[in-house]
Amino acid sequence: MNEDLKVNLSGLPRDYLDAAAAENISAAVSSRVPAVEPEPELVVNPWDIVLCTSGTLISCENAIVVLIIFHNPSLRAPMFLLIGSLALADLLAGIGLITNFVFAYLLQSEATKLVTIGLIVASFSASVCSLLAITVDRYLSLYYALTYHSERTVTFTYVMLVMLWGTSICLGLLPVMGWNCLRDESTCSVVRPLTKNNAAILSVSFLFMFALMLQLYIQICKIVMRHAHQIALQHHFLATSHYVTTRKGVSTLAIILGTFAACWMPFTLYSLIADYTYPSIYTYATLLPATYNSIINPVIYAFRNQEIQKALCLICCGCIPSSLAQRARSPSDV
């Protein structure tokens, strides 16, 4: 039959029918082809960026201290061993914060979560324990001033280092070995995957160590005041000079202890009273100051030390400034 004789029973224009047929064919074809869903955009929490930045600063600062102490054979006294332990712990803490950011957004898995939280717990525990060990060492160096540099003191320092790192590693292994809340979210603390009980143990341990440090620093203040008074009498210093020296020593100790408490106390108390149901912004707001303590530690304990300052100057410019070479240690340098 001739095409011109075909009857259009629908009464619609032929162009419209051709277009409708094309749309039907296109719809049928597209229904057989699976739709490609767009990949979800990676949304990064600004708090995680701040924590990662903090971890980077921590790592850079403390890496310098570790390298100075490791490469300088003269820095092998008990005090420098403990400062090196503190710097190494803070260095690992900074690395833990960086790896936590990388694994959270690039390599998400249960294994990476457990390894990262284990590293962070172990390193921060070692950092706090090293601060306590430094406080003990300072107390012993003042209380047993005549016998402090004996072989017995070096042995005691190594025993403290083994104990504090052994305890810290054990605390870090607890989440990895199974004490976590990955299978039961109701037991989670403010920091997943730590359990509420695990966080409580860490918080109570911190409060106990803080109480010990407070007691030791009170005793150190008494010894410093007594030594400063004796030096003033021997050298016929004025009373105002004795007062200024004592005040500097007490102020230094107050700054050290106050900084430590201000950094760690908010997160410690929050971990005791809160759980996983609380908004995460509170966890970030209290955890971030705790990381600042690892940024401040090298300034307080390492870069203020004369010997480390000399070693750093030798590395950077190959000479020791006359102000460092001639500076005498005073009772306020505690």
From Swiss-Prot:
Protein topology in the membrane: Multi-pass membrane protein
Residue positions where Phosphoserine is found in the record: S330, S332
InterPro entries: GPCR_Rhodpsn, GPCR_Rhodpsn_7TM, GPR12, GPR_3/6/12_orphan
UniProt superkingdom: Eukaryota
Extracellular side of membrane: 1-48, 99-113, 180-199, 274-282
Principal subcellular localisation of the protein: membrane
Family annotation (CDD domains): 7tmA_GPR12
A cellular component annotation (GO) from this entry: plasma membrane
Glycan attachment points: N8, N24
Keywords: Cell membrane, G-protein coupled receptor, Glycoprotein, Lipoprotein, Membrane, Palmitate, Phosphoprotein, Receptor, Transducer, Transmembrane, Transmembrane helix
Transmembrane segments: 49-69, 78-98, 114-134, 159-179, 200-220, 253-273, 283-303
Lipid-modified sites (S-palmitoyl cysteine): C317
Localization annotation: Cell membrane
Any Pfam family hit: 7tm_1
GO biological process: adenylate cyclase-activating G protein-coupled receptor signaling pathway; G protein-coupled receptor signaling pathway; intracellular calcium ion homeostasis; regulation of metabolic process
GO MF, one example: phosphatidylcholine binding
Segments on the Cytoplasmic face: 70-77, 135-158, 221-252, 304-334
SMART domains: 7TM_GPCR_Srsx
Record family assignment: Belongs to the G-protein coupled receptor 1 family.
Role noted for this protein: Promotes neurite outgrowth and blocks myelin inhibition in neurons. Receptor with constitutive G(s) signaling activity that stimulates cyclic AMP production.
Identification of the protein by name: G-protein coupled receptor 12
Organism: Homo sapiens
Lineage: Eukaryota, Metazoa, Chordata, Craniata, Vertebrata
